């Protein structure tokens, strides 16, 4: 494909226009009085969202060079989302401010490389400052973090705090759509483990990059599955039942994996494969635990059991399964509560008998996974659009709360960023030339989030920042008063703030050192069909579906 090239100031200006286009769409959502953004969908009703990452992913610009700038900003949002689960809008606002200041100084003759070094030194100083300011989360702080991260929704804050209290801060908490209008919390049997899908082609929700099944059947085996032949009988049986299928095994690879992916892509069968957790004998024990939880049978080599003899009765059942790139959560039915209780008792007896510290630790982990249960927040709303928006807010709040448990909390509302900006004075004074300018770029950018929070609340950002500095307190954008935000319960997760700063500095410092931009040359539009006839040419018939059962591919019963 032919390429387009852009050089020097022209290339950087195009990138900046792309950065601004995306950031201006995202920045309106920041703060408790942030606005919503409407996203058109190819099918169905438009989405109304308040989530920076969701907005950023939707943006694609006509100009190829500007689009590259937008794509770089999407990286800021997605990286922060992946690592912290929240803070995407803050990271985007910070990056935009740094890019603008950095390119202005570059155009004035500053060395981009020295600017970058100064910005990186500022980043290290900020990380250290955050660590000093963070406080361990305790008591009511969990509810406060969740409330702030959900846009001030007290009900969500209370519900997340209650969920963490019941299943512990390390427990499994999932968010799903409710069939009623109310948002409810339910504690049920379930388990989570750190294994994700074997192929990204199993994803059912492209926006969130997860695979979700309701009422799936679960095939459990300690075998490695390489060929599809052994699986054909059970796949045909599951297809007739109309249920999704999760395969938990030592590994699914080669021909078997390729065939499953193809059948999933063609809509023949809703299926996903996940490697079983742990290793060796511990893997078999983990699979046996899941079998008890789901009422299934472990198809084990030790018992000379084979996959081609599996029946529907051998498969486990769950209420819901959620699979991400790295984790799998099984929300079980309550049908097997007694069996789970007996299994936990048996593991406790093993725990009492063992003298190995390592074995003791692993047995305790198994007990925690089986007995801890799963907290399910069932989100309800009057309309589908509001339901999606509310679900996104709750997921963000849950992620931010987990981040707060990891690294503690700091004062929210942009006040900690303003304090960190003022603390950079000493670092800037110790440097000379363009490195000092690089620190000052970060220093000015750190005020951008509070400036935008104030603007979204109908206040003058410059006046609010001056008021915060003179009073030594934060600005509560909801009430419009200056107060101690930590005492008022307006707090942020330190991890979210740290990653927002680090990711924004990383992308901005790379962008201002850009000298050449290379983009794909847009292809000319396809010519319109000749004549006034049917542009589809009558479809020419479908020629049959070629899908008797799951036939095709030269294998009995498989596509």
Curated annotation (Swiss-Prot):
ATP binds at residues 29-32, 86-90, 413, 476-478, 492. One of its GO terms (cellular component) is cytoplasm. One of its GO terms (molecular function) is ATP binding. Keywords: ATP-binding, Chaperone, Cytoplasm, Isomerase, Nucleotide-binding. It catalyses: ATP + H2O + a folded polypeptide = ADP + phosphate + an unfolded polypeptide. The keyword Chaperone applies. It comes from the Bacteria. Its EC number is 5.6.1.7. Residues 521-541 are annotated as: Disordered. Its main location: cytoplasm. GO terms for biological process: protein refolding. It is found in: Cytoplasm. HAMAP family: CH60. Together with its co-chaperonin GroES, plays an essential role in assisting protein folding. The GroEL-GroES system forms a nano-cage that allows encapsulation of the non-native substrate proteins and provides a physical environment optimized to promote and accelerate protein folding. Belongs to the chaperonin (HSP60) family. Forms a cylinder of 14 subunits composed of two heptameric rings stacked back-to-back. Interacts with the co-chaperonin GroES. NCBIfam families: GroEL, PRK00013.1, PRK12849.1, PRK12850.1, PRK12851.1. This is Chaperonin GroEL 1. It comes from Synechococcus sp. (strain CC9605).
């Amino acid at each position: 494909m032919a390429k387009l090239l852009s050089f020097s100031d022209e290339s950087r200006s195009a990138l900046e226009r792309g950065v601004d286009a995306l950031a201006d769409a995202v920045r309106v959502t920041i703060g408790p009085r942030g606005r919503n953004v409407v996203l058109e969908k190819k099918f169905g009703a438009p989405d109304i969202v308040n989530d920076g990452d969701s907005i950023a992913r939707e943006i694609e610009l006509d100009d190829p060079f500007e689009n590259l700038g937008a794509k770089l900003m999407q990286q800021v949002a997605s990286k922060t989302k992946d690592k912290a689960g929240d803070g995407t809008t803050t990271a985007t606002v910070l990056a935009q401010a740094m890019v603008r200041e950095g390119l202005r100084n570059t155009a004035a003759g500053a060395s981009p490389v020295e600017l970058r070094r100064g910005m990186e030194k500022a980043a290290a100083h900020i990380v250290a400052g955050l660590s000093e300011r963070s406080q361990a989360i305790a008591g009511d702080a969990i509810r406060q973090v969740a409330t702030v991260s959900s846009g001030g929704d007290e009900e969500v804050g209370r519900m997340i705090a209650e969920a963490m209290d019941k299943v512990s801060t390390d427990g499994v908490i999932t968010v799903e759509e409710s069939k009623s209008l109310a948002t409810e919390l339910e504690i049920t049997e379930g388990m989570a483990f750190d294994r994700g899908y074997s192929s990204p082609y199993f994803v059912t929700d492209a926006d969130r990059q997860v695979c979700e099944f309701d009422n799936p059947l679960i095939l459990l085996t300690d075998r490695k599955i390489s060929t599809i032949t052994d699986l054909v009988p059970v796949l045909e049986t599951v297809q007739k039942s109309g249920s999704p299928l999760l395969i938990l095994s030592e590994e699914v690879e080669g021909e078997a994996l390729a065939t499953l992916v193809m059948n999933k892509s063609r809509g023949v069968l809703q299926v996903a494969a996940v490697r079983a957790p742990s290793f060796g004998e511990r893997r078999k024990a983990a699979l046996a635990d899941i079998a008890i939880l789901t009422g299934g049978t472990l198809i084990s080599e030790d018992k000379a059991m084979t996959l081609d003899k599996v029946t529907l009765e051998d498969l486990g059942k769950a209420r819901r399964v959620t699979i991400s790139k790295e984790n799998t959560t099984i929300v079980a039915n309550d049908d097997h509560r007694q069996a789970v209780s007996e299994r936990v008792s048996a593991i406790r007896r093993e725990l009492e008998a063992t003298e190995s510290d390592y074995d003791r630790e692993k047995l305790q982990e198994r007990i925690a996974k089986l007995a801890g249960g799963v907290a399910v927040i069932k989100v309800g709303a009057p309309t589908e659009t509001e339901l999606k928006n509310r679900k996104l807010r709750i997921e963000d709040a849950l992620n931010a709360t987990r981040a707060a448990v990891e690294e503690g909390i700091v004062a929210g509302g942009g006040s900690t960023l303003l304090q960190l900006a003022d603390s950079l004075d000493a670092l800037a004074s110790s440097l000379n030339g363009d490195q000092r300018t690089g620190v000052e770029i970060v220093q000015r950018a750190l005020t951008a989030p509070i400036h935008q929070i104030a603007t979204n609340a109908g206040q003058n950002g410059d006046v609010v920042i001056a008021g915060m500095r003179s009073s030594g307190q934060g600005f509560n954008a909801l009430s419009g008063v200056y107060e101690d935000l930590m005492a008022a319960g307006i707090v942020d997760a330190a991890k979210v703030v740290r990653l927002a700063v680090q990711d924004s500095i990383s992308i901005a410092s790379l962008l201002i050192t850009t000298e050449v931009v290379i983009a794909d040359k847009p292809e000319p539009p396809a010519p319109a069909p000749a004549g006034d006839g049917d542009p589809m040419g009558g479809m020419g018939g479908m020629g049959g579906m070629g899908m008797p059962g799951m036939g095709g591919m030269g294998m009995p019963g498989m596509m």
